[in-house]
């Protein structure tokens, strides 16, 4: 299997992220309460927590789909807004256009001679042979691979993942976790993964951040060699530590549903 052609070093480095005093309110409800984060370039971070804790709101702020009520979001020393072109977002729904073939979904919005690049991106996710098929012919896991290829073709420095594997069966989910990890190690982008699956968070991330009622309740380094042996004692111990903390946190009301942005406002791997 070939991989995407080597890019200049600038494109292979992740974006360092920082938030300072980050707050978000919806009406009278404060969903994020002064979040302070420092994420080195190229780190793989998983964000976990109960439903309604604020983790999805945090990801929306990082993606530029919503604006903070107070505080700062930085890419290095610059406002995060300046890194929007180098940021891509994947959702649980692959959001493929059903009237466009797979390769055209990957190259959506591109101009010039983009088809060779789209084929390279598809090959990097193992789907070059499905380039000229319709999305309806693909399984759920294959559709997410296409969405990932659509992100990779832009050589992102920041990849935001909002429960992208939540609808997949267990085996396909593990395969996608391994694929995302391999591509992250190859390209060096910064990854933030929002997930309800604690085992997934511990298996793939360098660091697991637990959001509790809008605040950072736990910031755990996963200091395990890669590739990680699933079922190992150390992995199970870390998973248990995070899960016990999640279960001890009180539940919260669901996060408010924001107004859906127009398709042209999204940088969801297109």
Swiss-Prot record:
Disulfide bonds: none
UniProt keywords, alphabetically: ATP-binding, Cell inner membrane, Cell membrane, Membrane, Nucleotide-binding, Translocase, Transport
SUPFAM superfamilies xrefs: P-loop containing nucleoside triphosphate hydrolases
EC number: 7.6.2.14
Region (Disordered) residue spans: 249-270
Compartment list: Cell inner membrane
Residue ranges constituting the ABC transporter domain according to the UniProt record: 17-238
Pfam families for the chain: ABC_tran (PF00005)
PANTHER family given in the database record: ALIPHATIC SULFONATES IMPORT ATP-BINDING PROTEIN SSUB (PTHR42788:SF17), TAURINE IMPORT ATP-BINDING PROTEIN-RELATED (PTHR42788)
Protein name: Aliphatic sulfonates import ATP-binding protein SsuB
Gene that this polypeptide is encoded by: ssuB
């Amino acid at each position: 299997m070939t991989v995407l052609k080597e890019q200049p070093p600038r494109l292979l480095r992740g974006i360092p992220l920082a938030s300072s005093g980050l707050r978000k309110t919806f009406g009278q409800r404060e969903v994020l309460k002064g979040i302070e984060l420092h994420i080195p370039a190229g780190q793989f971070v998983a964000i976990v927590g109960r439903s309604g804790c604020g983790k999805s709101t945090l990801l929306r702020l990082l993606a530029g789909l919503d604006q903070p009520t107070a505080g700062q979001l930085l890419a290095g020393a610059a406002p995060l807004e300046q890194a929007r072109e180098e940021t891509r977002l994947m959702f649980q729904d692959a959001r493929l256009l059903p009237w466009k073939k797979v390769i055209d979904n990957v190259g959506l919005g591109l101009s010039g001679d983009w088809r060779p690049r789209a084929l390279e991106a598809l090959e990097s996710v193992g789907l070059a042979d499905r380039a000229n098929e319709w999305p309806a012919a693909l399984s759920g896991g294959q559709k997410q691979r296409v969405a990932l290829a659509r992100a990779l073709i832009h050589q992102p420095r920041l990849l935001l993942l909002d429960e992208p594997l939540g609808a997949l069966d267990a085996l396909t989910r593990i395969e996608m976790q391994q694929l995302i990890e391999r591509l992250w190690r190859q390209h060096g982008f910064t990854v933030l993964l929002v997930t309800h699956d604690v085992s997934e968070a511990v298996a793939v991330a360098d660091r697991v951040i637990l959001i509790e009622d809008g605040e950072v309740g736990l910031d755990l380094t996963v200091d395990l060699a890669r590739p990680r042996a699933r079922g190992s004692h150390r992995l199970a111990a870390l998973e248990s530590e995070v899960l016990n903390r999640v279960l001890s946190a009180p539940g919260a009301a669901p996060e408010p549903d924001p107004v859906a942005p127009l398709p042209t406002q999204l940088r969801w791997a297109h």
